């Protein structure tokens, strides 16, 4: 996991979800770690694929398809986050130890959207992640800006969703 981790609260994460079609947005935690794009698509994704291969799930199947891949990529990143931040509140207080971050989760979710092609349509599940993009300097203060990434969990590539596809997102879970 990266050394310097930005954090974002649920309300701020909701702000960055503006423009997607769904009202079905679910947040299971109150704060999230923002992962660097280069780590997420590089080392993070490569180690995820190794983990899948160890379990014999390295290839797409009818019963191991897009939704399973998207959920498992999110889960894998959450497992790494928990492993690298092992101390509970009690541990930190009694043993005087620190985690890299104390947020509950990573800012990688699962989204479902509609794909329309020449007279047919289907649903597809991918991952949505928020990564650092730069800085904004305002009278209210300086802050990091984030960018929304859509990741195809089958091959680890960034997908460019059209406005219509973003508007068709019917479920998002972080």
Give the residues covered by each predicted segment:
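A structural boundary/capping signal
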Residues: 1-174
């Amino acid at each position: 996991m990266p050394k310097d981790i930005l954090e974002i609260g649920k309300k701020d994460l909701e702000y960055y979800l503006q423009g997607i079609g769904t009202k079905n947005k679910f947040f299971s935690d109150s704060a999230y770690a923002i992962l660097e794009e280069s780590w997420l698509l590089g080392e993070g994704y490569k180690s995820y694929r190794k983990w899948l291969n160890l379990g014999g799930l390295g290839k797409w199947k009818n019963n191991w398809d897009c939704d399973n891949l998207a959920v498992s990529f999110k889960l894998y990143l959450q497992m790494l986050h928990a492993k690298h931040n092992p101390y509970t509140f009690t541990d930190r207080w009694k043993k005087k130890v620190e985690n890299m971050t104390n947020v509950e989760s990573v800012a990688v979710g699962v989204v479902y959207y509609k794909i329309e092609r020449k007279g047919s349509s289907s649903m597809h599940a991918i991952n949505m992640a928020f990564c650092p993009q730069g800085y904004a300097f305002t009278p209210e203060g300086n802050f990091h800006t984030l960018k929304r990434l859509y990741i195809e969990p089958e091959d680890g590539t960034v997908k460019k969703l059209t406005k219509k596809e973003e508007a068709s997102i019917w479920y998002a879970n972080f």
